[in-house]
Amino acid sequence: MADNSIDGLRARYGDRWRWLAVCTVMLGTMATVLSATVVNVALHGIMLEFGIRQGQVHWLATGFIAAMTTTMLASSWLLDHFGVRKTLAGAMVLFTLISIVGGFAGTPGQLIAARIGQGAMAGLMQPMGMYLVFRIFPRERRGQAMGIYGMGVILAPALGPVLGGFLVDQLSWRYVMFAPAPVTMLGVFMAWRFLPLPPSRPEPYRFDLPGLLLLGATIGLALDTLNRMQELAGAEWRIGLQALVAAILLGLFVVRERSARHPLVNIALLRNPAFVYANLGAMALGLALFGSTYLVPLFVQTSLGFSATEAGLLMLPAGIVLGITFPLAGRLADRQSARKLVVFGIAMFAASAMLFAVSDVTLAFGWLALWTILGRIGIGFMLPALSTGALNPLKPEQLGAASSTINFTRQLGGAFGVNIVALTVEFGEHSDGLPTINAFHSAWWLVAVFVAVAAVPVWRMRA
């Protein structure tokens, strides 16, 4: 039998094996990021085909992010028990099948269910890049490996909207669901060849399934409560009851995590004020990143008459600039005050959102692209500095749990951010069943205010 341990694979393929393994995991991450971004340019077409409004279509983005946020906390247990090869290959197989089924969806409910399934598998795959790099590379080569891995991760959101726009305009929105499948199919083949099996069966420990179920129910119910606010007239009691149940479930989750031997979220970390402030900043970052990625394509297609391809091309320069900004901001975060860099990023993004909030239908493509770039520069400065500010004050043994927590918080901010901006657009002014430019202006102002207010706790990080 072939030796599929780390040493066995290195002996079989030589030093290039490490890079083949990194490329394998990168394929999984690229597929999930592609899936998260490519659908946004298809939302307008989906609304028209199914005759639905913001109150339903936003679940294609919100459901994906919420499911990803919840299941990413389960990846550590799966990696410990099954190893990176079986976990990644299994998640990619399921992701592929769900994507294909979603492409044939006949109702909005079926499509939303497929997006939730995609998000659940994406949550399992997303943390594996850093895990693998730290397992197979020596300390002095990890930075280089993360840089190569990061290039692929950044490439996907830059190209995703362009690919999605082309598929929608030339074929159908259904091909947006099919798009990640070839990538994950190749990833399954490579995973079975290049990813290691664990050298021995690890000592088993109980997975915190009650915690995961409580967390998933809390997030889902809270998001649905927000969504139902558009039906406020005559439904106040139902909305209030749902909000109360969500609050009770959240309380039960906190109690569970405080008593569990292997909790999903280490509640004790929240005793560190700097970590709490950084997590508030991370929630604002999630709202900024996912909220703007949702809003920009829908805004320019619905209010400005852009095609799906034009909407994707509008996002492309911003994705490239984000890829350039990210490593630069990372180097600055090692030398400069983290809070100053984050506040600078907040200011840049808030300025971008305010410029969108005062735009009109005569605005040229170039100006819209420039404002999108401005927002991505802000996000590029926020992301690495927030991680530095959150993790630097902690003890070495807390870093793993803290890293997982801040990633979770950022995704949670994204899930609620998309829901809130979609609700704002839905409540706004409409004409012929579609939101007017004024409805989108309200959403952009809301995003700008939310992100700007986050500067207050971020400044108190003292990092």
Question: Positions of the model-derived regions?
Answer:
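C-terminal membrane-cytosol helix-exit motif in multi-pass small-molecule transporters
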Residues: A181-S200, G216-R228, V245-S259, A454-R462
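Alpha-helical transmembrane segments of multipass membrane proteins
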Residues: I100-V101, F166, G220, D224, ...
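Short, Lys/Arg-rich, polar N-terminal cytosolic tail immediately upstream
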Residues: M1-G14
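12-transmembrane solute porter fold
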Residues: R18-L34, V39-L43, F50-F64, T69, ...
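Juxtamembrane C-cap of transmembrane helices in multi-pass membrane transport proteins
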Residues: D224-A233, W445
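Helix-loop-helix hairpins in multi-pass membrane proteins, especially solute transporters
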Residues: M72-P210, T362, P396
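A gly/Pro-rich, aromatic-decorated transmembrane alpha-helix motif that marks the paired
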Residues: M151, L155-L171, G220, D224, ...
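Flexible interhelical linker loops that connect adjacent transmembrane helices
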Residues: L9-R12, E140, V188-G216, G234, ...
